[in-house]
């Protein structure tokens, strides 16, 4: 009989996944702290000291999440050296979709010509990209698809209150994409947790703007992220010294520094692009991944 957990060697169950291409896109308009301080009671020094952010990219009128997502997707497909027709599924993580439906993924499909792909969006705020990656990973491991395009795309500038200085200074717009493919070696592990007690710490309603309890989110992240990192390292039998980069969601430089300290890992192993991008929500991890890739800082086999 078949016993769960008993896997035959050489079956599809052994299939793992790897990133075979990356791409990113940000709006050309840059909004720096000095310009923010012309219409908000804030200053460059105040923002930088608390967040590490100097500037952020802001979408022009009519520049949508799908437009940025499609730009990032085209670059990722080119980087992977494949044709758009080879993409079998497109998953877009976004909290700022063009429409409630059609999904942003459908709009991307249309723009890039991935006519054979299954398409859907996924909404999980800043963690969206990781959830989308875990779904793509599961699809490939199950043998359903061979190549999946995973995108994080946000135009947060359209949903923040530009009079709320505690929130609007944090966010930026952008999109990052990866093509996930099959890999017979290596191991991909996802461990996703959600804090059941803090659902209201960061909200975006249908009628109003983003509302955030920054202090609560900060203390949660500094406490919980190191635990999750340790869990993944243990499960993959990897020592923290073997890890080249820890690529975290780019929410706040102070937060990332605190996490590095708690893990007792040099902060240099935590790449950041907050200074020029701000918090791009679901786009932050894939945008950063693509930047590292373009700077030739990633080598196949890196952890």
Predicted regions, residues:
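Short, Lys/Arg-enriched N-terminal segments with co-localized hydrophobic residues
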Residues: 1-14
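Acidic, glycine-rich active-site loops and adjacent beta-strand->loop/helix elements
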Residues: 25, 93-98, 124-129, 152-157, ...
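Condensing-enzyme catalytic core mediating Claisen C-C bond formation in acyl metabolism
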Residues: 14-61, 162-223, 227, 303
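Flexible, glycine-rich active-site loops centered on histidine and acidic residues
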Residues: 139-172
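Phosphate/pyrophosphate-binding loops at sites that engage ATP/ADP/AMP, CoA/4′-phosphopantetheine
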Residues: 72-87, 228-244, 292-297
């Amino acid at each position: 009989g078949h016993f769960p957990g008993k896997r035959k060697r050489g079956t599809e169950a052994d299939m793992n996944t790897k990133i075979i291409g990356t791409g990113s896109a940000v709006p050309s308009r840059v909004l720096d702290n000095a310009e923010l301080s012309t219409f908000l009671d804030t200053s460059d020094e105040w923002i930088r000291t608390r967040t590490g952010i100097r500037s952020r990219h802001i979408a022009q009128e009519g520049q949508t999440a799908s437009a940025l997502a499609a730009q990032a997707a085209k670059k990722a497909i080119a980087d992977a050296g494949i044709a758009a027709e080879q993409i079998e599924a497109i998953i877009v993580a976004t909290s700022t979709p063009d429409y409630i439906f059609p999904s942003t993924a459908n709009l991307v499909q249309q723009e890039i010509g991935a006519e054979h792909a299954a398409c859907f969006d996924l909404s999980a705020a800043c963690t969206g990209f990781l959830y989308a990656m875990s779904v793509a990973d599961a699809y490939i491991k199950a043998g359903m698809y061979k190549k999946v395009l995973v995108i994080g795309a946000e135009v947060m500038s359209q949903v923040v209150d530009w009079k709320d200085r505690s929130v609007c200074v944090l966010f930026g717009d952008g999109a990052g994409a990866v093509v996930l493919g099959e890999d017979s070696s290596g191991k991909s592990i996802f461990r996703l947790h959600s804090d059941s007690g803090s659902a209201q710490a960061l909200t975006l309603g249908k009628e109003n703007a983003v509302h955030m309890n920054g202090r609560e989110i900060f203390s949660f992240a500094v406490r919980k992220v190191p635990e999750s990192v340790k869990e993944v390292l243990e499960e993959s039998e990897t020592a923290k010294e073997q890890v080249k980069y820890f690529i975290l969601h780019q929410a706040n430089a102070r937060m990332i520094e605190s996490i590095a300290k708690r893990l007792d890992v040099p902060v240099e192993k935590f790449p950041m692009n907050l200074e020029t991008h701000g918090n791009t929500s679901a786009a932050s991890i894939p945008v950063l991944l693509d930047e590292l890739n373009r700077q030739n800082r990633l080598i196949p086999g890196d952890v």
